[in-house]
Amino acid sequence: MAVAMDNAILENILRQVRPLIGQGKVADYIPALATVDGSRLGIAICTVDGQLFQAGDAQERFSIQSISKVLSLVVAMRHYSEEEIWQRVGKDPSGSPFNSLVQLEMEQGIPRNPFINTGALVVCDMLQGRLSAPRQRMLEVVRGLSGVSDISYDTVVARSEFEHSARNAAIAWLMKSFGNFHHDVTTVLQNYFHYCALKMSCVELARTFVFLANQGKAIHIDEPVVTPMQARQINALMATSGMYQNAGEFAWRVGLPAKSGVGGGIVAIVPHEMAIAVWSPELDDAGNSLAGIAVLEQLTKQLGRSVY
């Protein structure tokens, strides 16, 4: 690395970025998320050899929201063939808001990628077809990857999202009309919102996602999570589609595969080296953590890291 990693470096980056807090806006379209303290700021790094670095509010749990879309895709990859998955969802950036209906109708009910709502709902529909208890299975996967046995769903957030789910329900019904949604809409929506309502800390997220930096292998599990090729494919999707319609801007500023969520979290991957998780609840206009992106930008500059 250009700079040797330690907690002091991370603490200094948080100090540099903290003045940005107050310039973004906490997600308020989900009432249960609107009450989160917007001043929170944390970062954690887990290296492929198991070292952990952290600063700020790195151990406070928050709603991971769309970061869970990566995890649901991982579970689907373990139960479906490549052909079965990618005939129902694409691999291209959407360039549209994450909950867009217009593009979906124009493209005959086939979502652009699995990291927007449309694609994630198709993935959840697939999980409903192969798993007897999809929500429990997701908990088992996350607890296993993180090494933390008490990670759970925030049922208040899940309920709040379900009560304000008209647009996602419309997405599901539109895909059903095109033959690309096979199970009960309400059941799949409930699963989807529970996945989004997983509560995890930056430390737990970094430990969970380090397998994507380690060719598909978690650091404390013998069996590979995914194959090296699948890990590379997931990282590629994160690079092109992980930051909503601002993936290009993020690639320019940060240069790493990443996935964000409207809870203010972002997970980024340095292949062969580390997983990084940041959290700051205030969002920019695209729904990405405003200060979180700035933290990652400063970190990659100081470490001299980019996949480009």
UniProtKB/Swiss-Prot annotation:
Coiled-coil intervals, chain numbering: none
Entry EC number(s): 3.5.1.2
Binding site for substrate: 66, 117, 161, 168, 192, 244, 262
Reaction it catalyzes: L-glutamine + H2O = L-glutamate + NH4(+)
Hydrolase listed as a keyword: yes
Enzyme type, top EC level: hydrolase
Gene Ontology BP annotations: glutamate biosynthetic process; glutamine catabolic process
GO molecular function: glutaminase activity
Keywords tagged on the record: Hydrolase
Presence of the UniProt keyword NAD in the record: no
InterPro entries, sorted: Beta-lactam/transpept-like, Glutaminase
Family: Belongs to the glutaminase family.
Subunit text: Homotetramer.
Protein name per UniProt: Glutaminase 2
Originating species: Shigella flexneri
Upper classification of the organism: Bacteria, Pseudomonadati, Pseudomonadota, Gammaproteobacteria, Enterobacterales
